[in-house]
């Protein structure tokens, strides 16, 4: 009896049953890949620096202005005008007005672009300017677009808009995106902020399910820095350098505000945040 029990205990797999170890190995491999994906995309390797924050300067200190320019790259520039825009009912009309007024160039970099009324309006405005001889450059993040081959993108391409998709999604770099929202008109009028080109931002920000957000219209010398920020990812994606007066015209003084465009990217980790 005991021998039969021992035999039954050893020979637990019946004829026709599949072995379990391939499934266990597959599960372990999948878990390892998932862990590697999370670590690679959300916890980039970088040296951790712990320190207290001291108030070394006041905002109006000339030394602060010089230091910020030296550390962050571009200098702080005087003579700008910044107009705050709140929510879709202010932001979208201002941006569309800027696009429709363009005479020479439009550069537009965006993260979120979802098909709907808002994206259709922007696609039609950009397409119209391209048909009228304006050089239109549209750079769209791959992950943020729900229809890379949708009607809006196709409309722009048919009209002559130079459309580029930034970093098609790859497993090991899925989180390396561009979240920049940059629109520059004729090199002299810029828009920057948090809004996406989607119906989710329509209205006043008081409707349930729709976003509240801020954007800014910028005029003056700092627009050249905004244009240069667009050129970073355009050059990476298309290997085309946009230059000359149509993109970088002489900037006139537009107001009395001091501004600086500070750039960051996914590959920089938290270094930019520390600065």
Region roles according to the model:
Residues 11-275:
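Charged, low-complexity intrinsically disordered terminal segments
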Residues 1-7:
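Charged, low-complexity N-terminal segments of organelle-associated membrane proteins
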């Amino acid at each position: 009896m005991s021998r039969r029990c021992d035999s039954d205990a050893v020979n637990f797999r019946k004829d026709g049953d599949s072995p379990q170890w391939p499934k266990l190995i597959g599960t372990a491999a999948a878990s390892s890949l998932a862990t590697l994906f999370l670590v690679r995309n959300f916890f980039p390797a970088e040296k951790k620096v712990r320190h207290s924050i001291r108030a070394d300067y006041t905002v109006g200190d000339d030394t602060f202005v010089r230091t910020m320019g030296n550390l962050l790259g571009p200098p702080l520039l005087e003579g700008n005008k910044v107009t705050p825009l709140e929510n879709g009912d202010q932001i979208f009309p201002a941006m569309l007005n800027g696009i429709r007024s363009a005479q020479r160039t439009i550069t537009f970099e965006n993260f979120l672009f979802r098909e709907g009324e808002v994206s259709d309006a922007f696609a039609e405005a950009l397409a119209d300017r391209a048909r009228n001889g304006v050089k239109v450059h549209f750079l769209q993040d791959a992950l943020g677009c729900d229809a890379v081959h949708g009607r809006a993108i196709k409309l722009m391409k048919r009209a002559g808009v130079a459309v580029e998709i930034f970093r098609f999604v790859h497993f090991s770099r899925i989180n390396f995106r561009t979240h920049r929202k940059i629109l520059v008109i004729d090199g002299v009028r810029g828009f920057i902020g948090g809004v996406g080109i989607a119906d989710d931002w329509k209205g006043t920000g008081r409707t349930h399910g729709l976003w509240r957000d801020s954007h800014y219209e910028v005029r003056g010398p700092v627009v050249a820095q905004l244009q240069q920020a667009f050129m970073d990812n355009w050059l990476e994606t298309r290997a085309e350098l946009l230059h000359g007066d149509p993109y970088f015209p002489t900037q006139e003084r537009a107001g009395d505000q001091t501004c600086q465009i500070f750039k960051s990217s996914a590959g920089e980790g938290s270094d930019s945040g520390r600065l």
